[in-house]
Structure formats: structure tokens, C-alpha cells
Amino acid sequence: MHYPEPISKLIDSFMKLPGIGPKTAQRLAFHTLDMKEDDVVKFAKALVDVKRELTYCSVCGHITENDPCYICEDKQRDRSVICVVEDDKDVIAMEKMREYKGLYHVLHGSISPMDGIGPEDINIPALVERLKNDEVKELILAMNPNLEGESTAMYISRLVKPIGIKVTRLAQGLSVGGDLEYADEVTLSKAIAGRTEM
């Protein structure tokens, strides 16, 4: 189907988002065309602002407007425990349960040799640097229960154990192959309470 160039560009742009195929992208593009111009401008500004106004915390790697992030700045947090997660959505999921009071470290991915992603390609070197702090006594590995998550957890466990820091893994109950961000608060709460040492 031939579309005017602006519509084609918009469809192509929407298709870059995860889970958006050609039909959904087309539907979104035509919906955008029907929106009021000021709503479209606000939408476009929100997209640009997300890229311009957010950064990654220099301590934990979580998205933030201020560096360090509000979690790392919170003096009430238990600084002896760091929960390692794959991405920012996992921090948000963990924070929703309101039970975990430690700090986080966001890897921004997982080890995936099939995709050419090794330990140096994600935020593992910064984690190792953080662990030189004597305050850290436990590392909770909260990777997704899939092959890449398990590989990443095993790699970090082997890397950290010689340092003498306790390494634990979330209890099962999270479905294998699932994503942490989709787990409900009760499941996450039980997984953190029942974590096991690696």
C-alpha cells in the first residue's frame, strides 16, 4: 500500500516500538492524524523530553531526573543489600511491592552469547566497582527466569563469591521464561522473602 511520505515515516517510527507490528503502527499513525494538533505537539514533546531530561544514575544505573537517583540518595535504605535487576522496569516492579528497602543495580540487559552480548556489554563492571564498598553484605540476583537471566545470575555469582559477599537468588514462583516486570506484588514479595543462597 502506498501512503503519503509523512504517514509512511510515522508508521515506520511506530514499528520501532516493541510489540508494534505493521497493522498496529498503521492504526496508531491514522489515529495521530485524527488528533488535535496541540495534542500531537504535546505527545511529540513528551517523547523528546524523555530523551533529553532523563539520565542514568551514576551509582545504580536506574533512570532519573537527578543524579544520583532518589533511591541511592535515600539515607533510610539498607546499604548492605543490593538487588541486581536487568532493567529499569524491574526496579519499578520491585518498588511497587513496598517491602524491599535495600539498593538496586540496573544491568541494562543480560548476557546473551547468541546475540553477541557479553558481561562487558552490560553494567557488570560498574557493579564490581560498587562491591568494593565494605558496606555491601548481600547481593540479591533478581534476573528474569529465562536462559539469559540464569546465565547472567550464574556469571555474577561466580564473579562475586570470592569477594565474600552473600549472593542470593529470588525464590521460584516466578514463571520460567517470564519477565520480572509482569509479576504481581504478592509473587515478588514471596520471591524476595524466600530467596536462596547461590
From Swiss-Prot:
The keyword Cell membrane does not apply. PROSITE patterns: RECR (PS01300), TOPRIM (PS50880). A zinc finger (C4-type) spans 57-72. Keywords: DNA damage, DNA recombination, DNA repair, Metal-binding, Zinc, Zinc-finger. InterPro entries: DNA_Rcmb_RecR (IPR000093), Hlx-hairpin-Hlx_DNA-bd_motif (IPR003583), Rcmb_RecR (IPR023627), Rcmb_RecR_Znf (IPR015967), TOPRIM_dom (IPR006171), TOPRIM_RecR (IPR034137). Residues 80-175 form the Toprim domain. One of its GO terms (molecular function) is DNA binding. Pfam families: RecR_C, RecR_HhH, RecR_ZnF, Toprim_4. GO terms for biological process: DNA recombination; DNA repair. CDD domains: TOPRIM_recR. NCBIfam families: recR (TIGR00615). Belongs to the RecR family. May play a role in DNA repair. It seems to be involved in an RecBC-independent recombinational process of DNA repair. It may act with RecF and RecO. This is Recombination protein RecR. It comes from Staphylococcus epidermidis (strain ATCC 35984 / DSM 28319 / BCRC 17069 / CCUG 31568 / BM 3577 / RP62A). The gene is recR.
